[in-house]
Amino acid sequence: MAFERIFNIFVYFDDGLARHYGVRHHRRTGSDDAKCEHLRVHVDGDHPLAQRFSLPRSFTAEQWLAAQRVGDVLQYFEDALTLYRASPSPVFCLTSIVDGMPKIDRTIGPKSFRGNQVMASEIFGSFPDYLVEYVEADRLDLPRLINDDYFIAIRTLFNNRLYVSCTKLLMSCIDTLAFVEFGDQPGNFANWLDTYVTLTVHGINSEELWEFRNSVLHMTNLASRKVLSGNVSPIVPYVGTQPTLPAASPGSPKPLNLYGLIASVADGIGKWAESYNEDRDKFLAFVERYDLTTSDSRMAWCPVQGHT
């Protein structure tokens, strides 16, 4: 039986950031399971002796988890695998080393970190994984994901004339998309709108919609602090066939067609989704951040003893 070169690969996190990885190789025969077990039992001895290489980019722990969720992480170790003449599909064991110590939360196979491996819980059952449910031809269908997570409910509320609740959920949807795009930073709501949504057709700007969002989400009124101070014009949504309406008088609230705004945000989501087609690093940020969200369409159903 031929010997195969197999690899213990280590990602070194120091002070919360990974900049380097290490590789220690072995030559073994036997089944893949036996080879993997050999690598696992040598983790403690191998990681201090591994040859170190620079990662092509730095990773936080959350970013590295997202990279494993997305797919083939071996691309980040190409320099070492080329140097050691690895086979196209090498047997490997990948372990994080956190401040000098192996950190193993769970053991998984070589495939992408998805589905029940990520979402299963003994207490809460299994949560659907959007990277499984919404991937078609190796591409994530972002418009369908956002439709199911937000716009089904937004349309349901609108069609049932629950316009205030509909507006609140629309603002929450923009909040989520802005966080996913720009992270938790000031101005992300307005930045997302300015980048992807045409608001001028509605006679408003992103700052005005941000202040409207603050008032309607937090207090269910139309008067944020900046609106009350006179620094920003107030907005009042309406539902009707007229796409726009003039303000009743100078300084009075600007009318905003709610249906028109929903349509404009939906168009913006299409443009936003297109921006992920070619940018892998941006997609990693999406997975890192969207993993933190919750949704009506991704709920766990689990049996409770004594109940049906």
Positions of PLM-derived features:
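Terminal, compositionally biased low-complexity regions
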Residues: 1-130, 195-198, 204, 280-308
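Boundary/linker elements of alpha-helical solenoid repeat scaffolds
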Residues: 129-138
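Alpha-helical solenoid scaffolds in large eukaryotic transport, assembly, and signaling factors
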Residues: 137-145, 176
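Hydrophobic packing residues in well-ordered alpha-helices of helical domains and bundles
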Residues: 147, 154, 166, 206-209
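Solvent-exposed, amphipathic alpha-helical segments
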Residues: 149-157, 212-216
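Short, contiguous, well-structured surface segments enriched in hydrophobic/aromatic residues
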Residues: 153-194
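Amphipathic alpha-helical interaction surfaces
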Residues: 176-183, 195, 199, 215-223
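Long, charged low-complexity segments
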Residues: 201-282, 287-292, 296-299
